[in-house]
Amino acid sequence: MVTIVLGSQWGDEGKGKITDLLSQKAELCCRSAGGHNAGHTIVHDDITYDFHILPSGLVSPTCVNLIGAGTVVHVPSFFKELASLDGKGLKDVRDRVFISDRAQVCFDLHAVVDGLEEAGLGTRKVGTTGKGIGPCYSDKAARRGVRIGDIMDEGVLESKLRSLEAGYRRRFGELDYNVEEEIARFKEYRSLLKPHIVDQLTLVKKFEDESASILVEGANALMLDIDYGTYPFVTSSCTGLGGAVQGVCLNPTSIKSIVGVVKAYCTRVGSGPFPTEQLNEVGEKLQVAGREFGVTTGRKRRCGWLDMVLLRYSARINHYTALNLTKLDILDDFDEIKVAVAYKLDGKELESFPASSDALEKVEIVYETLPGWKSTTMGVSKWEDLPVNAQKYVEYIEHSLGGVPIKWIGTGPARSHMIDRN
C-alpha cells in the first residue's frame, strides 16, 4: 500500500521528519518530482543529514529508494550527496538508490540559463534557487530534453547536449559555459551511473505485486505547483497529489494515506504573494525562533501567520487523509496567535482562493485571534502533556479543515520530538 507525504504550503514545512518516521516501515521510498532545488533536514542519532535530490528513505537501512520519472537530476549533485551520506556513516547507500531512465538530466548549462532568465525578469523575478530546474523542465516540455537513459549512449548524449547549447547561444549570445567540459565529465559519470539506472515501471510493479509498503516523498509544496500554486511564482513541476502519482507511475487505487505537512505558521522563500506575511517584529520573531533559513539556498525565509484559506485550498486539491503539524514549539512565546480565516478583495469576501497572483497581492486578510500558551512545548512527546491552549490550536486547525486529523505534531528538530496521536 502507498503513503504519500506532501507539503501543504510553500515548502520548508518539515517534511523530512515525518518521511523519516514513515520510511522506517517502508520497503520502497520514492521522489516523484523536482530536483536538487528541494531541501530538507533529518536528525538521526544526533547526526544531521541534508537531502536535496536523494530520497530520505536512505536513512532507513532496509529501504530501497527511487528517483522517479517526474524528477530532474543534476548528476554531480547526485554523487556529491551520496558521498556526504557515505561520509556520515550511512551503510550501503549506493546499493539502495536508483534513478528512473525516464528522469530528465539537469545540466550545468541549465543553471547558467536560469541565471540569465532571472536577470531578464527584473522586478518580476520568480526568486528561483538558480539550480537550473525551470530551464530543464522547459526543455522537457519542448521535447528537446535529455533523459537519464540517454547518458548510456555517448553519441546520443553529445548530440542532444550540443543541440541544447547551440539553441541557448542563439537566444542569449555569449554564455559562461563550456559544452566540451560538460561532455567530458559525463564520460566519467557514465560507468558510475550505470548501476543506478533502472526501468522504473518494472521496479515499482515488483513492489506493488508484493503488496509492499511504498512511501512517496513530495518535494516543494502545493503552493509552488506549476498548475495550482501562486503562478508564475512557482516551481516548474507538479508538486501535488497528481504529480506524485504520475512521477512514480502509481496505481491510484493502492493509495492508503495522503499526509499533508503543515507548518504551525507560514513561510516562503523567494518572490511571490504571501497574504499573511508579517513585515514587522512578529515576522522577525518567527524567523529567529524558527531558524528560518533555506536548506538549499541559505536565504532567509519570509514569515507570517497560519493561513487557513490557503490550507483549505491545498486540502481540496491534495485530498489529505491526515496531517503532520510541525514546529508548534516556535509559537511557545506568543501571547496571542493570529490565523487567517478569509480574504477580502475590494471589500468583498472571496469565496475561493484566487488564481491571480496580482489579486493575491491585494487581498485584505480577515484574522481570528487565538490565545497563546506561553510555556514550552519543546520535546513534548505526549498529547496530554501539551498546554491546553496548544491543544486547542491543534483542534482549531482540524475543525477548520473539516475534521482531517492531525496525527503527528512536531515539537522540535530531533526525531524524538514528535507527538504520535495514532
UniProtKB/Swiss-Prot annotation:
User: Which residues are noted in the entry as IMP-binding?
Assistant: D12, E13, G14, K15, N37, A38, G39, H40, T129, R143, N220, T235, R299
NCBIfam families per UniProt: PRK01117.1 (NF002223), purA (TIGR00184)
Species of provenance: Arthroderma otae (strain ATCC MYA-4605 / CBS 113480) (Microsporum canis)
Q: Which SMART domains match?
A: Adenylsucc_synt
Q: Tell me which Gene3D superfamilies the record gives.
A: Adenylosuccinate Synthetase, subunit A, domain 1 (3.40.440.10), Adenylosuccinate Synthetase, subunit A, domain 2 (1.10.300.10), Adenylosuccinate Synthetase, subunit A, domain 3 (3.90.170.10)
* Main location (coarse class): cytoplasm
Q: What is this protein called?
A: Adenylosuccinate synthetase
Pfam families under this entry?
Adenylsucc_synt (PF00709)
In this protein, the active site sits at: D12, H40
Q: Which residues bind substrate?
A: V295, T296, T297, G298, R299, K300, R301
Uppermost EC category: ligase
MF terms in GO: adenylosuccinate synthase activity; AMP binding; GMP binding; GTP binding; magnesium ion binding
Q: How is the cofactor bound?
A: Binds 1 Mg(2+) ion per subunit.
Q: In which pathway does it act?
A: Purine metabolism; AMP biosynthesis via de novo pathway; AMP from IMP: step 1/2
* HAMAP family found in the cross-reference section: Adenylosucc_synth (MF_00011)
User: What Gene Ontology terms describe where this protein resides (cellular component)?
Assistant: cytoplasm
Complexes and interactors: Homodimer.
- Where does this protein hold Mg(2+)? D12, G39
